[in-house]
Structures are given as C-alpha cells and as structure tokens.
Amino acid sequence: MFGTKIITDGKGIKEILDRRTETIYPSRQEAEKRLESGNRLRIYYGIDPTGPDIHLGHTIQLLFIKELAKLGHEIILLIGDFTARIGDPTGKDIARKPLTVEQVSSNMKTYLEQVSKIIPENLFKVQYNHSWLSKMTFEDVVKLASHFTVQQMIVRDMFQERIKNEKPIGIHEFLYPLMQGYDSVAMKIDGEVGGNDQTFNMLVGRELEREYLGKDKLVFVSRLLVGSSGKKMSKSEGEIIALTDEPQEIRRKVLMINDTMLRTIAELCTEKSYKWIDERQLEGQPPKNPRAFKEELADELVRMYHGEKAVNESHKPRKTSGGTNVVSSILAAGIVPSVSRAKELVNQGAIEVNGEVVKDWGFKTKKGDIIKSGKGIEIEIEKVIDK
C-alpha cells in the first residue's frame, strides 16, 4: 500500500506545505524537520458522514494528504461514523440534531467511491471511529473528560455566542472534541489534517495524545474555501460543488462563482501548476479573462470528478424543468436565486432564448427551448411546470 522509500526532498515538502496549509502546530519548522527525517509518519484526515456528499471544500485536505502519501507516508482516512451521531458543534449557534445509526450508514455508502476520485485507494487505508468509541465504558469517558475543564470548552466563540443569546449548550457538545481528540490516541497518530474550523478539536487531540501516549502530534491546519459572503462555503448558501454533482451542474455552479474566488479554488482544489494559474490570474490581481478562467476551471473539476469524456458532456445544455415564462424558467433552473434577480438579468439583456435576446419578463417559454445567460450557463427546458 505504502512505498518503501520516504521522499525527503525539502523543496518539494515546502511547496506542499505552502500551497494548502494555513498554520502548523507545533510549528512549520518542526513539520519540515519530521517530514525530511526519512521516518514514515502516520497521518490522518477525518470526515463525519453528516450528509451523503463530499464536496469541493473536502478536496483541499484530500489533495494535501494525497501529496503526503506520494512522499511515502502512511495515510488514514477516518470515517467518523460514531462522532457523526453526536454532531460537531463547531460553527453552530444551536445544537446539532443527533443522527441515527441508519442515517449515518446511508450517508457514508458512497464515501470511498467519492474519495477515490481525488486520491487512489492504494494510497490510503480506512478506519471507522466506532471501532474504539463504541467500546468505551462510562469510566473511560469520565477519565477522558477529566483532561479538560468547562472553562476550556466555553471559551469557544460559538458557545460564548449561545451564552450571550441565552441558548442552551448540551453537555454532549463538550464531549465531541474529546471524542475526536481520542481518535488520535486510538490510532497512535503522528499528524492530523483538517480545516481551520477544526483547529480547536485537533488541538484537543494533540493534548490528549501527549497525555495518554507522550507523543507530540503535528496538526496541519489547511486553508478554508471562503465563499462570496466572506464565510466558509456552505450548503445553505448554495455554493457547494459536490463530487457527485452531474457534469453540467458542476459547470453551472463554477460559472456562477464570484471572480474573486477563482484563483483560490484553482490553488486549493486542483493540481494545476502555479504557472498555469498565474497565466490566468496573478496573485493579488483580478483574473485576466474571468469567463475563460471559469470555463477552464469547470473543465478541470469535471475531469477530476467524472473523467475526460464527461468534459464535452458538461458543455451541452443542462436539461431541466422550466416555467411558462422566461423569469420563472431561469428561476426554476437555478440560474438565479430570486425573481428580482431574474428580472434584472432580463432587463440587462443578459438572457437569450433560442439565440434571441429577451427583454420581456412575460416572454413565453416551452418545452425544448434553449435558454442561455450572460455567464454562459445554458439550459434546455425538458418539462414545463405551470404554477
């Protein structure tokens, strides 16, 4: 599974760390030292199956551990099938609703298939944290909890916000970072990879591993994919590109991405060289040709998730349900988030129906019509829904 030789090329290691990490604990220098030591490190990345899809944000960490695997290190993909039933409180202003065993099992059915689109299965092994967490006794849990104080937990921003707004905090929410932290102990980990929203949880694991095993775990905090709102890209904002999205849907979503995000996505979520990226957008500068950059970025993501043949397929009009007029049709197709925005595009002459610019909100649409937006999104009405 893992190569017999550990690659210790300092320049290559620095480039890997530069591209996708934001912070490293205990330090960048220590990480470089260990990666250049010639020793095989056991490094893991964990995903809780709280939903059925792995998305663009996950690929940052997956591409990072892929690079570490290619250096010869032992990579573990940890499926948090036990922790998913509790729910990570990170970033939540209310407690997560616990998931059932059945829901978690359903969510993770295609996880390995999705992950293998990014990192070949021969470069990592899989573990599930129910293997050790489900066997813990109440005595074990009390011992685990004794390593941290309530004060250490409630300093977290989300808990402070709930206290301020008089919203409840469940005791089980304090246990989540302890359980995630114990994963490192159970697997005797040398390093953990996660987004910066997971920093607290990963540092809990670092402290627990030091106390239980006397090991000083490396924590690789990756850069986060920030959406147009300035916050972490989220499903609720409709910005998430899932690895299971159809080729045309991936293209539609990429074409709607804010121009300011293009370089970041190319850096974090593809394996394209910096030379390729710089040719399209220099760091700190606007894209040279935003539309062309989006088209090429869409091609690359489709290629990564669905293969070369799907790239041509993604350029075809996406078949979708439409309405009886142009406004309701582009709204139903997901080209715009609201009726007002749909009307704006029509007023601007940014919508074509069958090759003709339409400036009438009430312009009738029918099955078979091809509608194109100024962003290059193209749909074919397969079925008319009259509401």
What label would you give each PLM region?
Residues 89-105:
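A charged helix-plus-loop insertion that forms the helical arch/lid used to bind
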